[in-house]
Swiss-Prot record:
It comes from Cryptococcus neoformans var. neoformans serotype D (strain JEC21 / ATCC MYA-565) (Filobasidiella neoformans). This is JmjC domain-containing histone demethylation protein 1. Residues 416-579 form the JmjC domain. GO terms for molecular function: histone demethylase activity; histone H3K36me/H3K36me2 demethylase activity; transcription coregulator activity; zinc ion binding. One of its GO terms (biological process) is chromatin remodeling. GO terms for cellular component: nucleus. The keyword Zinc-finger applies. The JmjC domain mediates the demethylation activity.
């Protein structure tokens, strides 16, 4: 909704009837009426003679008097840019509120919309704060002169009558942008009067005109944030000139054949060398010192990774033909970082007209970074690296349409449900080397094409950028890892390592619109490193890396995002950063929470069968890699916290419903039980390896020690430990009624009665007010007749108020053997208050307020 201004005319206009109609009030002046300028009494005018200017909120489309905003309280006056307020007050004084300063506004938002945009209860907050803007960077003298002129009206005294006084904003014609809506109003009315030859028109235009202004499109802001691009391009071209330092990354290139899941899991335990490549530890991908992995053509190129790309002569026009010429795509204007929708054919024609062999190159630089190509002819020519397909959560855990027998295609060939003699399926097992590995992979791809249910499509992207394109600092959604191969052209990456401090700095930077506009992120982190990629180069960006991208020449790139089980902690951390910085849902990893439940359900099933008794088994299944187990502990804690929201009666209903809707109920029947079962099963395996942290509880941590073997087998020594293990086995062999067995006792059901208050008049001796007497026993608890001086004291009339509060609570639970236990508690609270009136003798002077005594008694 673009900013709108205009002037309203009533049904019976002064020109038509000669009767002056009071102006319509806005939401701010409905009770008091429109404000009057100071000069109205001097000139003998009334409110009917004043030209009230209207302005509409770009968010809710509510109309307001500009004068009411200018004269309103701080909340409403604060919605106007400060420069406009100061200019109006300086040049127009007290009459400034009635001038046409609205002409200087670019965008404006009302106070309720501003408050809602920053409210924690808003389920879909804007990506950037709502801020009123101006048309120009500064207000020119001609703008000030124009604002002081009266609004132009039609010169005709026989203006056609309007059918009603309802305001209906009129959209400006395509390509038309008027500087003065009042002039536009006049010309339209005159043209209509000429066309009707003075006859009153039944369909006369109604309401205020609407000025067409540029709209900010917030799509793709996960990868691109609106910034003054030119200054960053100048900075990266010559960092020393601006006092900055950008280091060459010098990340060593790796052989493509090394990058497999087997290499990722080649380190048996922390601190031990890799069994595949002792010099290249897999922690380079998932450890705290992880860094981008680069494969150059001389190291085997993309094909050595098990991937496949289209032929080298692929052009943007070919991409349009293979994906679909009419396919809509978001095209980003690099100079403003605003995006618009183009067809791929229009994009291809623009690139063709801007190619280097043409005499005149288009000055506008555009960038396409969000073209997902799954299910297209182009997708058949692109195959992600093998390591991506092996560990990608979507490929390995998402439940696509069920195949024959109600099983997912990834479950084919496993035999009956007992799994006797079969190994536990790990990530990527559908791609295991063997006779049917390729067949299962083809089945999975075919299932993706045929499925009617949505799933996260983020693994196949085609990125096309023009020379000079810039994508500002970002972390890919949910800290997902990225594979990135240059088909043609070149790219320059700027990296910031995802350390704890750097992630905090990034969260601060990305959560502030002002910092994104004028702060180089490199000033807030420890260092920035640069990597240059050329045609044929491939790079895998690890989890959570903060990066920006520059395009030195026209380029076509293929890449994709993937989540995995080796950095779940960082993935969950970035999910929270996205929530804290109010990233809209459409810019986050699609269906992330649902995917987490699928992962948990599969791993929990695998761990359950890992310990199952198989009398005819010929092989011994191996537990997941220690790094996967460590990350599953983070996943389990996250899911436990999600189920905690579901069971929290004090949580907002909206939050509880959000968690509930993201749980795949067809697969996960007992979310709390699944989360907690996964937690203790993971802790048991970590305990067996001797890797259970102090923060994780579990009896297995104290009883099982690892012998350090690669497969994590366990050797137990000592009779005492053996006896404990035997006792535990009897417990775990017993079938529980529910997986939530004995996790938490049931909550108390409380019943609190209303207070019972009784007031009576009694005869009691007045107690002493001295502290020494109170200690010695004087007072209500002392013997009757004891006075302050130890002598007898007469009874006096007093008012005794007794309040009794009774509270009971009860809970009941049933054990596995059918035993029912009921517990109840009862508490009685008694408060007594005794009041003696003022004395009528000489002591009344020293104690004019009387005496109040309270006595509390709690009876359990």
């Amino acid at each position: 909704m673009s900013e709108q201004v205009g002037q309203r005319e009533a049904v019976d206009s002064p020109q038509a009837t000669g009767v002056k109609t009071p102006p319509e009030p806005c939401p701010l002046c409905r009770e008091t009426g429109p404000p009057q300028p100071p000069s109205i009494t001097e000139e003998g005018k009334t409110n009917e003679d004043i030209d009230f200017i209207w302005v509409a909120c770009n968010k809710c489309d509510e109309w307001y008097h500009s004068a009411c905003l200018f004269l309103g309280d701080e909340k409403w006056r604060g919605t106007i840019p400060k420069e406009i307020i100061s200019t109006v007050e300086t040049n127009f004084g007290d009459e400034g509120a009635w001038t046409n300063w609205v002409e200087w506004i670019g965008k404006w938002y009302c106070a309720p919309c501003l408050a809602r945009s920053t409210s924690p209860s808003n389920p879909r907050p804007p990506r950037h704060p709502l801020v009123a803007t101006m048309k120009r960077a500064s207000i020119q003298p001609k703008d000030i002169d124009q604002a002081g002129k009266p609004l132009k009206r039609s010169a005709s005294t026989s203006a056609p009558l309007l059918k009603s006084n309802i305001k209906r904003p009129r959209t400006s014609t395509k390509g038309q942008e008027t500087a003065s809506p009042e002039i536009d109003m006049k010309s339209e009315r005159e043209q209509q009067a000429e066309s009707t030859a003075g006859t009153p028109a039944s369909d006369a235009p109604q309401g205020r005109p609407k000025r067409k202004t540029a709209q900010i499109d917030y799509r793709n802001l996960n990868n691109s944030i609106a910034t003054p691009t030119h200054q960053w391009l100048e900075l990266i071209a010559d960092p020393e000139k601006y006092g900055r330092t950008i280091l060459d990354a010098n990340y060593p290139a790796l052989p493509g054949k090394l990058l497999t899941r087997a290499w990722l899991e080649s380190q048996p335990l922390p601190g031990q060398p890799s069994s595949i490549s002792p010099d290249l530890l897999p922690t380079r991908f998932w450890g705290p010192d992880r860094e981008p992995l680069i494969v150059r053509p001389e190291n085997g190129g993309f094909s050595s990774l098990g991937g496949h790309l289209p032929s080298k002569d692929l052009t943007v026009q070919d991409v349009a033909n293979l994906v679909g010429p009419d396919r809509m795509v978001d095209v980003i204007d690099v100079s403003s970082q605003h995006s618009s929708q183009w067809t791929l054919q229009k994009w291809a024609e623009y690139i063709q007209s801007s190619s280097g062999n043409t005499s005149v190159r288009n000055p506008k630089v555009y960038n396409v970074i969000s073209l997902e190509i799954s299910g297209t002819e182009l997708a058949k020519k692109v195959k992600p690296p093998k390591i991506v397909r092996e560990i990608d959560w979507v490929d390995n855990f998402w439940r696509f349409n069920a195949g024959a027998g109600g099983k997912d295609v990834k479950e084919k060939g496993r035999g009956n449900d007992s799994r006797e003699g079969s190994e536990i399926r790990k990530e990527g097992s559908h791609l295991t080397e063997g006779d049917n590995g390729g067949e299962i992979e083809e089945d999975l791809e075919g299932l993706k094409e045929k499925t009617n249910t949505p799933y996260p499509k983020v693994q196949l992207y085609c990125l096309m950028g023009m020379k000079g394109a810039w994508t500002d600092w970002h972390v890919d959604f949910a800290a997902s890892s990225v594979y990135y191969t240059i088909h043609s052209g070149a790219k320059v990456f700027f990296f910031v390592k995802p350390t704890e401090q750097n992630l905090k700095a990034y969260a601060e930077w990305s959560g502030s619109y002002e910092k994104q506009q004028d702060t180089w992120l490199g000033d807030m982190v420890d260092e920035v490193r640069k990597v240059e990629l050329h045609a044929g180069d491939t790079m895998i960006i690890p989890t959570g890396y903060i990066h920006a991208v520059y395009t030195p020449m026209d380029s076509i790139v293929f890449g994709g995002n993937f989540l995995h089980s080796y950095n779940v902690d960082t993935q969950l951390r970035l999910r929270q950063i996205e929530i804290d910085t109010k990233v809209p849902q459409r810019f986050r990893f699609p269906m992330f929470d649902r995917l987490c439940w699928y992962v948990a359900e599969k791993y929990c099933s695998d761990l359950r069968h890992l310990r199952a008794y198989r009398p005819r088994a010929t092989t011994t299944p191996k537990p997941p890699h220690f790094r996967v187990l460590q990350c599953l502990s983070y996943l389990a804690n996250f899911l436990v916290s999600q189920t905690g929201i579901l069971e929290d009666p004090e949580a907002e209903d909206k939050a509880r419903k959000l968690v509930h809707d993201r749980i795949p109920g067809d697969i996960v029947k007992d979310p709390e039980g699944l989360a907690k079962e996964l937690k203790w099963r993971v802790e048991r395996e970590l305990g067996a390896l001797g890797l259970l942290g102090e923060e994780a509880s579990g009896v297995e941590a104290e009883e099982f020690k690892s012998n350090g073997t690669a497969n994590g087998s366990v050797k137990i020594k000592g009779k005492e430990v053996s006896r404990k293990r035997d006792r535990l086995s009897k417990v775990f062999d017993k079938k529980a009624i529910s997986r939530t067995w004995d996790f938490h006792p049931p909550a108390w059901s409380e019943n609190r009665q209303s207070p019972q208050i009784e007031t009576t008049t009694v005869q009691l001796p007045r107690p002493s007010t001295s502290s020494s007497d109170a200690i010695s026993g004087s007072g209500p608890g002392a013997s009757p007749g004891a006075s302050a001086n130890g002598g007898a004291n007469e009874n006096e009339q007093a008012e005794l108020t007794t309040m009794l509060v009774k509270q009971t609570r009860k809970r009941m639970r049933e054990l596995d053997d059918g035993t029912v236990i009921e517990e109840s508690q009862e508490t009685t609270f008694v408060e007594k208050k005794t009041i003696w009136g003022p004395k009528l003798d000489k002591e009344k002077i020293s104690q004019p307020q009387g005496k109040v005594e309270e006595d509390m008694d709690i009876d359990h």
